[in-house]
UniProtKB/Swiss-Prot annotation:
This is E3 ubiquitin-protein ligase HACE1. It is found in: Golgi apparatus, Golgi stack membrane; Cytoplasm; Endoplasmic reticulum. It is an enzyme of class 2 (transferase). GO terms for biological process: Golgi organization; membrane fusion; protein K48-linked ubiquitination; protein ubiquitination; regulation of cell migration; ubiquitin-dependent protein catabolic process. SMART domains: ANK, HECTc. It catalyses: S-ubiquitinyl-[E2 ubiquitin-conjugating enzyme]-L-cysteine + [acceptor protein]-L-lysine = [E2 ubiquitin-conjugating enzyme]-L-cysteine + N(6)-ubiquitinyl-[acceptor protein]-L-lysine. Pathway: Protein modification; protein ubiquitination. PROSITE patterns: ANK_REP_REGION, ANK_REPEAT, HECT. The N-terminal lobe of the HECT domain is important for interaction with E2 ubiquitin-conjugating enzymes. The ANK repeats ANK 3, ANK 4 and ANK 5 are important for recognizing the RAC1 substrate. Residues 1-21 are annotated as: N-terminal helix important for homodimerization. Homodimer. The homodimer is autoinhibited and stabilized by its N-terminal helix. Interacts with RAB1 (RAB1A, RAB1B or RAB1C), RAB4 (RAB4A or RAB4B) and RAB11 (RAB11A or RAB11B); in a GTP-dependent manner. Interacts with the 26S proteasomal complex through the 20S core proteasomal subunit. Interacts with RARB. E3 ubiquitin-protein ligase involved in Golgi membrane fusion and regulation of small GTPases. Acts as a regulator of Golgi membrane dynamics during the cell cycle: recruited to Golgi membrane by Rab proteins and regulates postmitotic Golgi membrane fusion. Acts by mediating ubiquitination during mitotic Golgi disassembly, ubiquitination serving as a signal for Golgi reassembly later, after cell division. Specifically binds GTP-bound RAC1, mediating ubiquitination and subsequent degradation of active RAC1, thereby playing a role in host defense against pathogens.
């Protein structure tokens, strides 16, 4: 009866408290009953359960083998913690990682738990498996108030973890100022190194902790490197911590020059150095001028080293340009002051800011004299010999006994007389054209061109940084004009110099024209790389389409009105952000990424030429499109043309191909290339043939009675449009017919669609600068925008006709098709362009190729062979005039020469 009553009472208590009132007999089950109560600090319930239980309060459970005392300390359950301590819980019991309850209380800032643990003799000096004590945890988290209480119980405040780091190390690294002061006040060793030799100051600088570094330096911390020689300053510069560098320089002024010298270290990230020097230069005008003057001096020294032929060109070139880039960056962002702004130092102003360029004048003087010297020798060779292809520098490599002769050093200021006398064993003799080159002679241009060009690049950068954006320094223009012949000699010898060092051409149209013929002769691939290098210069992420985007930057468009909705969102979007990356999402869809962007461009490229918008009309061959001169039927046509330009500019910027092809004349408009009468064939082949006929024949006695005016249909009414002022009264004659043809071409191909072209270019140039796109011709621009079309050679052969003596089985024809199979896809496209004027095959294949009068098969006509004769073409009738070459090798050579030399144009069959 008594036992039954006891069970009834237990049942009643359990139901009232909604929990068990007795612990299970085994510790494993019991501990999981108690743990949630301990975490909630339900000390009465825990006390009641423990009162009649044999539960071991030090029982370790779980994967990390912690006791309930660990749980209480970790959660801040102070009442349960005291209860467990009174029940005999061990305050120094370590879990599997070596942590005691005191470690956990310190890590989580549980002050009351820490105090109670210390009352019950918790050992503050116990280290966990990583060597960390409770004091380390307080230092890591900056719990200064708790640290004050704990250090009173610590026997050694400099106790080390497994890496030899003390609490002071970690407090400095995490920037906890009051914690650092508390540890120092408690006797922490301010210069104690860890196992790698890193001091607390080193740790503070590694994370740019300016305030803790200042506290350490104020208290006498030594400036020491680690065992690998890495200094606190090295760490500050590597992280771009300008404020911390400023503190170091305040206490160690000698470090200023160390930072300046670091600009020569190519292992340091340039943008980090810029950040540091930018911060330092903002502190005062005098500091700003000091930095610039020091950088100018270092640049001058490096520049003269670069001009030394015995130096390592690659290393010195990179060093000079790196220093100059940093110099120019700092110059532009000087400290705020009433006089701050662009300082035209090269235009005669003698202000303090312009004077920072003075040390560089020594380098520019050496550059100028080098170029004058080479120009003099070029002139001498022109007079002395018909062979002026090289200037030779005689220099002995070794004497007969094997003794090395000192290498040639370029002249420094005041030493040019040695170069001209040629006296002394180690001094060079500049040979005239009449002297015979020996095996030990070197081409002076080959030896110096790259070096001098790199210095020219540095000179341009320094000139430009003093000019307002978009303006070219008059001094630099004068310099290029003065040395025009030598610079052209450089690039003729080594065209790569243009891509490596003559970047100024892209920013100076007045100079670009001098070198354009050389640039256009360079491989398409090299020009593409140069194009994108400068197009994306300064952008933070080269993987543009994949860069993370802000939700506000996503282009949200509707599929059912993709053209109009895209036009609206693109017009409102930030242009700079669109250059950096594109993110597109279709309304009501979740998908994003490159696939969606690709689909967006594909759909838009089809919509741009959708007849419903009346923006473009098909050309005569049915494969290309031309702006519609009557697009004004759409009230928003100019806005849409601007949008079309934006889309093509964006596609080119992000290397996304569009599924659309334009007429040659429209590509020319984009490039700024004048159109000619041959371009008329794309919209009116018969009229193009008539213009060709006028040019090819004498019209003096034909009585055509043409004037410099034409009749044009303007919305159903015929109007006479003069080709030039008073054109209606000016007769077309044999003498002025070429002008007439050009003017009528411009009317048909340009004037009639000028507003549309202007609107398109306005959008296109938002993303593609005119100076960059002019690197290409109209065929290459098509390739950039739309990619390489595929050509089915078997279909080509099947739909080819032969005339003037050729038949399908002739050896020359067999060789021709073998060559077509052998050449690259790019060269096949060139061949198709060469003969038909188009790079694409129309829908349905070669059977549907159009000529001047309708369908016209590709035709090969025989031409008598003469040595070096090139193939020609008549594009109006798709005819290749192929000489009867004696071998396949000669045929291939002559054909490729014709294709790559751009022998395009119309001839009459």
């Amino acid at each position: 009866m008594e036992r039954a009553m006891e069970q009834l009472n237990r049942l009643t208590r359990s139901l009232r408290r909604a929990r068990t009132v007795e612990l299970p007999d085994d510790n494993e089950t019991a501990v999981y009953t108690l743990m949630p109560m301990v975490m909630a600090d339900q000390h009465r319930s825990v006390s009641e359960l423990l009162s009649n239980s044999k539960f071991d309060v030090n029982y370790a459970f779980g994967r990390v083998k912690r006791s309930l005392l660990h749980i209480a300390a970790n959660c801040g359950s102070v009442e349960c913690l005291v209860l467990l301590l009174k029940k005999g819980a061990n305050p120094n019991y370590q879990d599997i990682s070596g942590c005691t309850p005191l470690h956990l209380a310190a890590r989580n800032g549980q002050k009351k738990c820490m105090s109670k643990l210390l009352e019950y003799s918790a050992d503050v000096n116990i280290c966990n498996n990583e060597g960390l004590t409770a004091i380390h945890w307080l230092a890591v988290n900056g719990r200064t108030e708790l640290l004050h209480d704990l250090v009173q119980h610590v026997s050694d405040v400099d106790v080390e973890d497994a890496m030899g780091q003390t609490a002071l190390h970690v407090a400095c690294q995490n920037g906890h100022k009051t914690t650092v002061q508390c540890l120092l006040d408690s006797g922490a060793d301010i210069n104690r190194p860890n196992v790698s030799g890193a001091t607390p100051l080193y740790f503070a600088c590694s994370h740019g902790q300016r305030d803790t570094a200042q506290i350490l330096l104020l208290r006498g911390a030594k400036y020491l490197s680690d065992k690998n020689g890495v200094t606190p300053l090295d760490l500050c510069v590597q992280g771009g911590y300008g404020e911390t560098c400023e503190v170091l320089i305040q206490y160690h002024p000698r470090l200023f020059q160390t930072i300046i010298q670091m600009t020569q270290n190519e292992d340091l990230r340039e943008n980090m150095l810029r950040q540091v020097l930018e911060h330092l230069s903002q502190q005062s005008e005098s500091q700003y001028l000091k930095i610039l003057t020091s950088l100018a001096e270092v640049a001058t020294t490096n520049g003269h080293k670069l001009l030394s032929i015995s130096s390592n060109y690659d290393a010195q070139m990179k060093s000079l340009l790196r220093i100059v880039r940093i110099f120019c960056h700092v110059f532009r962002i000087g400290p705020s002051s009433p006089s701050n702004g662009i300082d035209m130092g090269y235009n005669g102003n003698k202000t303090p800011r312009s004077q920072v360029f003075k040390p560089l004048e020594l380098l520019w003087h050496s550059l100028d004299e080098w170029l004058v010297l080479i120009a003099t020798e070029l002139m001498k060779n022109k007079k002395d010999s018909t062979d002026i292809t090289s200037i030779l520098l005689k220099q002995k490599g070794q004497d007969q006994d094997g003794t090395s002769i000192p290498p040639f050093e370029p002249p420094g200021p005041g030493s040019y007389e040695n170069l001209s006398t040629g006296t002394g064993e180690s001094k060079p003799d500049v040979l005239g054209g009449k002297q015979e080159a020996s095996a030990d002679c070197q081409d002076v241009i080959s030896m110096t061109a790259n070096r001098l060009s790199a210095v020219i690049q540095a000179f341009y950068m320094c000139c430009s940084c003093q000019m307002p954006p978009g303006m070219t320094s008059p001094r630099f223009i004068e310099f290029v004009c003065k040395h025009d012949e030598v610079l052209k000699c450089f690039v003729n010898r080594n065209p790569k110099i243009i891509f490596d060092h003559f970047h100024f051409l892209l920013e100076c149209p007045e100079l670009m024209s001098r070198f354009m013929h050389i640039i256009k002769a360079q491989p398409f691939k090299d020009r593409c790389e140069w194009f994108y290098e400068h197009l994306h210069s300064g952008q933070p992420d080269s993987d543009m389409v994949h860069r993370p985007v802000n939700e506000n930057d996503i282009l949200l468009v509707h599929r059912d009105s993709i053209f109009r909705s895209s036009c609206e969102v693109v017009s409102k979007a930030n242009c700079a952000k669109l250059k950096q990356g594109i993110a597109v999402r279709f309304h009501g869809e979740e998908g994003m990424g490159q696939g969606v962007v690709r689909e967006w461009f594909d759909i838009l490229s089809n919509e741009i030429v959708n007849p419903d918008y009346a923006l473009f009309t098909q050309s005569a061959d049915g494969t290309t499109f031309q702006p519609n001169s009557n697009s004004s039927v759409n009230p928003d046509h100019l806005n849409y043309f601007r949008f079309a330009g934006q889309i093509l500019g964006l596609a080119l910027n992000h290397r996304q191909l569009v599924n659309i092809y334009f007429t040659r004349s429209f590509y020319k408009h984009i490039l700024g290339i004048p159109v000619n009468y041959q371009d008329v064939a794309s919209i009116d082949p018969e009229y193009a043939k008539n213009l060709q006929w006028i040019l090819d024949n004498d019209i003096s006695d034909l009585g055509l009675e043409l004037t410099f005016s034409v009749e044009t249909d303007v919305f159903g009414a015929m109007e006479e449009v003069p080709l030039k002022p008073g054109g209606g009264s000016i007769l077309v004659t044999q003498n002025n017919k070429a002008e007439y043809v050009q003017l009528v071409t411009e009317l048909r191909m340009t004037r009639a669609i000028q507003p549309q072209i202007n609107a398109f270019l306005q959008g296109f140039h938002m993303f593609i600068p005119p100076s960059l796109i002019q690197l290409f011709d109209e065929y290459e621009l098509e390739l950039l925008l739309s990619g390489m079309p595929e050509i089915d050679v078997s279909d080509w052969i099947k739909n080819t006709e032969y005339t003037s003596g050729y038949e399908r089985e002739d050896p020359v024809i067999q060789w021709f098709w073998e060559v077509v199979e052998d050449i690259t896809p790019e060269e096949r496209v060139l061949l198709l362009q060469f003969v038909t004027g188009s790079s694409r095959v129309p829908h349905g294949g070669f059977a549907n190729i159009m000529g001047g009068s309708g369908l016209q098969n590709f035709t090969i006509a025989a031409v008598p062979y003469t040595p070096n004769l090139l193939p020609t073409s008549s594009t109006c009738i798709n005819m290749l005039k192929l000489p009867e070459y004696p071998s396949k090798e000669i045929l291939k050579d002559r054909l490729l020469v014709a294709l790559h030399c751009g022998s395009y144009g119309y001839t009459m069959a």
